[in-house]
Amino acid sequence: RSSDLEGTIVNDEYFGKIPADRLIKENGIIYFKIDGLYRSKLGLPASRATDICGSYDSSKGVLTILWCSLPETPSVYVNGQWGPQEDPFAGDVINSYNDGPVEDGSIMGPFYEIETSSPGAELAPGASLVHTQKVIHVQGKDEQLVPIVQDLFGADLNVIKTKFQ
């Protein structure tokens, strides 16, 4: 959820604009269809990213929860866009990639991924930066997962399940 934050809600142009039937931004929640059938990637900029995100696989009843550490002060992130960039430190904190066929029909997966990035940092010798990411997969019946989704994301699992039908 990112309704109280400012700036671009989601960067959805890594491989061209993500079609509206695959990306919905509604009430502070981003719904991204991740089925391994359409190559696309999105990113959440630092002004919108929170320390938690997740995905739900309704066919297997698996909720994936990803927590990450965020810096206490505003930071810059390496830009993961392909090709030359005007600002190489205008990147995203959280990304999700959905694999799918490329122009020649080949495909690596199908698969999807969710990842987080640490701030881009020029460290002096001996200095360090710690970035922590934790991933938990919870498998269960919908009635068991509903309160978890509500508590962590402020979202209704039943709405999530029907968003792309």
Report the location of each language-model feature.
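Short, hydrophobic/aromatic-enriched beta-strand segments in well-ordered soluble domains
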Residues: 127-140
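A contiguous, surface-exposed recognition patch within enzymatic or periplasmic domains that forms
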Residues: 1-128, 147-149
